[in-house]
Amino acid sequence: MNGTEGPNFYVPFSNVTGVVRSPFEQPQYYLAEPWQFSMLAAYMFLLIVLGFPINFLTLYVTVQHKKLRTPLNYILLNLAVADLFMVFGGFTTTLYTSLHGYFVFGPTGCNLEGFFATLGGEIALWSLVVLAIERYVVVCKPMSNFRFGENHAIMGVVFTWIMALACAAPPLVGWSRYIPEGMQCSCGIDYYTLKPEVNNESFVIYMFVVHFTIPMIVIFFCYGQLVFTVKEAAAQQQESATTQKAEKEVTRMVIIMVIFFLICWLPYASVAFYIFTHQGSNFGPIFMTLPAFFAKSSSIYNPVIYIMLNKQFRNCMLTTLCCGKNPLGDDDASATASKTETSQVAPA
């Protein structure tokens, strides 16, 4: 084995020279230079400074403007709530531990940080699944004239939390475990060992199949069908130009969210899968640190995409920030094509 395994940690560094210490007790400066830990802390500070205001603003603007409280926006707000969980439950902890060079909060703190990071990522993934299904059902109409209403949105939000908890909670109760990863300043699922005492192998397989592969299959199926249907509807001119434009804009926004999710999380998932399938292989702490910390940037991109691509929300946000007056002078009529409401695009 090219790493050192302890009772509640795995350090990707051989202890032949006897320098390895528990990441809960002493700085891990034998893994990387102190300035590299400082860079991680600076990065986490940046994510907190950007992530909290933009996600809080998303929630606040929606509460302030009744016109934004549409069923589809419930799912988008769910993403903002998940991102805030990551900011407060994960990023603040990782900032502090990076400044100290090791996970100063011990195994209990590691469990909490790993839980919130996993929970936030899984809520985001399952929210994208719900959005994909909503777009598919509304645009492709496999169930005739289905209308995505408030009750459906609430059920979708509840579903995302149930599925996210089904992934994030088991390591807290004995099925797998959370341990420090990479440079040992943040925690995640144990992909490094089989750890039969906590049935780690079965959990990792369960996680990759149920909480990554299946959601990706559903998302790609829905959008594959959706793109075909929208093209057919446009070719046959079955709906007005305004309706088609509205549907294209909403669909484009959600697809971009999926693309950015993959950009942020696919490197982490790929590295984790490689480590799990190559037990004991030689890899450095940076190998897992970079994708793990890059994945944390997902807390920023969803609200940014929403603000940039949804004109109605952007106008409401500017009105809120400018004390009731939109400096651009855009009214609601100009934002009609960007409203995230139910679709009227007919099937092909």
Swiss-Prot record:
Intervals, Cytoplasmic compartment: 62-73, 134-152, 225-252, 309-348
Residues in coiled coil: none
Tissues showing expression: Rod-shaped photoreceptor cells in the retina (at protein level).
TM spans (from-to): 37-61, 74-96, 111-133, 153-173, 203-224, 253-274, 287-308
One GO location term (cellular component): Golgi apparatus
PROSITE patterns noted in UniProt: G_PROTEIN_RECEP_F1_1, G_PROTEIN_RECEP_F1_2, OPSIN
Changes after translation: Phosphorylated on some or all of the serine and threonine residues present in the C-terminal region. Contains one covalently linked retinal chromophore. Upon light absorption, the covalently bound 11-cis-retinal is converted to all-trans-retinal. After hydrolysis of the Schiff base and release of the covalently bound all-trans-retinal, active rhodopsin is regenerated by binding of a fresh molecule of 11-cis-retinal.
Membrane topology: Multi-pass membrane protein
Residues bearing carbohydrate: 2, 15
Positions bearing Phosphoserine: 334, 338, 343
Annotated segments matching region Interaction with SAG: 330-348
SMART domains tied to this protein: 7TM_GPCR_Srsx
Disulphide-bonded residues: 110-187
Positions in the Extracellular compartment: 1-36, 97-110, 174-202, 275-286
Residues bearing PTM N-acetylmethionine: 1
Key words, A-Z: Acetylation, Cell projection, Chromophore, Disulfide bond, G-protein coupled receptor, Glycoprotein, Lipoprotein, Membrane, Metal-binding, Palmitate, Phosphoprotein, Photoreceptor protein, Receptor, Retinal protein, Sensory transduction, Transducer, Transmembrane, Transmembrane helix, Vision, Zinc
Gene Ontology MF terms: 11-cis retinal binding; G protein-coupled photoreceptor activity; metal ion binding; spectrin binding
Domain of life (superkingdom): Eukaryota
Sequence positions bearing N6-(retinylidene)lysine: 296
UniProt-annotated binding residues for Zn(2+): 201, 279
Residue numbers bearing the Phosphothreonine modification: 336, 340, 342
Location in or out of the cell: Membrane; Cell projection, Cilium, Photoreceptor outer segment
GO biological process: absorption of visible light; cellular response to light stimulus; detection of light stimulus; detection of temperature stimulus involved in thermoception; G protein-coupled opsin signaling pathway; gene expression; microtubule cytoskeleton organization; photoreceptor cell maintenance
Role summary: Photoreceptor required for image-forming vision at low light intensity. Required for photoreceptor cell viability after birth. Light-induced isomerization of 11-cis to all-trans retinal triggers a conformational change that activates signaling via G-proteins. Subsequent receptor phosphorylation mediates displacement of the bound G-protein alpha subunit by the arrestin SAG and terminates signaling.
Family classification: Belongs to the G-protein coupled receptor 1 family. Opsin subfamily.
Record-given protein name: Rhodopsin
Annotated organism of origin: Mus musculus
